[in-house]
Amino acid sequence: MTLETTRRFTQRLHRRYAGYTLGVVAFVIALAAAERSGWPRHWIGGSFLIATVLVYAGIGLFSRTTDEAEYYVAGRRVPAMYNGMATAADWMSAASFLGTAGVLYLQGFGGLAYIIGWTGGYCLVAMLLAPYLRRFGQFTIPDFLGARYGGVLPRLIGVAAAVTVSFVYVVVQVYGVGLITSHLTGFSFEIGIFVGLGGVLVCSFLGGMRAVTWTQVAQYIVLILAYMVPVVWMNLSQTGSWTPLLTYGHQLRVVVQREGELLADPAERQVQSIWAQRAEEAQRKLVDVPAAMVDDAQRLAREREALRADDAPLARIQQIERAIRRQPRTEADARALYERDLALAQQQSQPLAGVSRQTEPFVRPGDRGSDDSAQTSARRNFLALVFCLMMGTAAMPHVLTRYYTTASVADARRSVGWSLAFIVLLYLCAPALAVMVKYQVFTELVGTSFGSLPEWLRRWSRLDAGLAWVQDVNGDGVLQFGELRLASDMLVLAAPEMGGLPLVVTYLVAAGGLAAALSTADGLLLTISNALSHDLYYRIVNPRASAVRRVMFSKLMVLVTAVGAAWVASLRIAGILPFVTAAFSLAAAAFFPALVAGVFWRRANRAGATVGMLVGLAVCAGYMVVGLPAVRLWLGWAPDPVRWFDIEPVSAGVFGVPAGVVALVLVSLLTPAPEPKHLEMVDRLRRPEPVRATD
């Protein structure tokens, strides 16, 4: 494209997306007017879902293509700012949109590891990888590994790692799609998954990277508006200020004060004591599960007969009968139930129900900071998590592929800057939102009588007891903080209702979360399908396949992968961020050493890269798997999990990356130097002219 053509293309994009933004604002205002006129909530939620998905589908349909360059890299003509916006949407997954504020609510200072790690990772992308990958100028990350190191093995390992990492991550996005769609429409979680899945497929299936790019720009506009509006509005209602980032210190001071009051509250301590007794009871049941099953059945039967004898209300009798029907029928089911009861009771018996104090650094949930060893362990895990997220961000295939789409190397570097700016805009708001939600819970919810609990809490409890849950543990009829459990995944979606904001804002947030999940799912599905169609099918299985045939095969892989991810997500994974962290650890261990060495170390060779990737993956995945109690039980090992330096399994990349680096360096030095064509490629990567694949 000539300079004049590029300028006109960019101006046309400015006009179109400015009009689109005005249209989004007008649509929200129209639905706000409809709410005031009496529209039912499911009409408003359905309108948000239908309108946004139709817009994304329209962009995908308009951008459909079978051209190879357009399908894989959007024709390499995406302006830096718009690629930055698309990258931010690709990045702002369900985990970022839904989980970041939630984890800051639950973990306080410890949750900042996610923000530091993710934003720091983009600095590594800008300095170490993005410009050089754009200069390389092919389609995928396995493409780079195959061209730089030669042979089949580096490319094949790259394909396997890209598919594994991206599939773990896309399952989380589909889970988020199901959660948000069910919130918008009232559908069940499983139906919500497959309804939302249509919005994912229509973009990535029809137009590949071209459709995904322009859809992601539109999705970023929706998600950033959806995140910032409730933050500003809640702060206005709580402090009277329009500038939340400058004034939410007021709410933070109140939160810190209330935490101290709750820790000293006799009613809270009574609730903790009752939970501790329940934990001991669950432990006793686990000692002899069959006997515990008999005892539970007899106890419930006695309670039912006593209620009937006392002519108790029918609702109370029916409640006991439902409890009898829900009793586990097998020993395995009973053991799983007692283990869940034990985990819940142990967490709720901790101070503040296991929620960390908001401003206290390096303290595990429930700990008051008096144990030096606990603080040391928390500090190690904080730094390990930051390390894994930074390295994983710099090695995530669906992120790096975006920098193939710019018009030049300079645009690729500028694009990283734009990406970081658009991402930071949301990440600056997340800590403020977490504090505002906790302020609302402490000042408006805790201390409320159970008969006056807000409708939003009842509705979320009905949707999924794992997301929101209350129980009058001490029987005083007043909600204590230890009798409340809110999952991190639902806090952002429920925040507008907590703050008493209009219903249209609640559904705007849900639409933003849907945009975040759809945008990342699109990018991940495309990464998986391209790895399978381009790197496996074309480069290894059938090198004579035509471009049209490869594109069609990629579309088929999009469909198959989406259905598989939907099935796994329908199993209702618990918590978003642990799965995301695991994906980043795997990406860091698999790709980061080989990619950076491929650019900056001429002596790195095929054998070194192959062994380095395999060793890094093996150490990382092995540490994760062996840390799982179920795996240890299956292997007949002691139930106590393995913890090197007390590092959590999800941060296994802190061991996998160094292991991969050591293996890559040693094997490269002990085996013959790379072939001249691969050395020449390294030299060309460091010079301005474009690079062509050499294998």
Label the predicted regions.
Residues M1-D695:
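Membrane-embedded helix-loop-helix hairpins and adjacent transmembrane boundary segments
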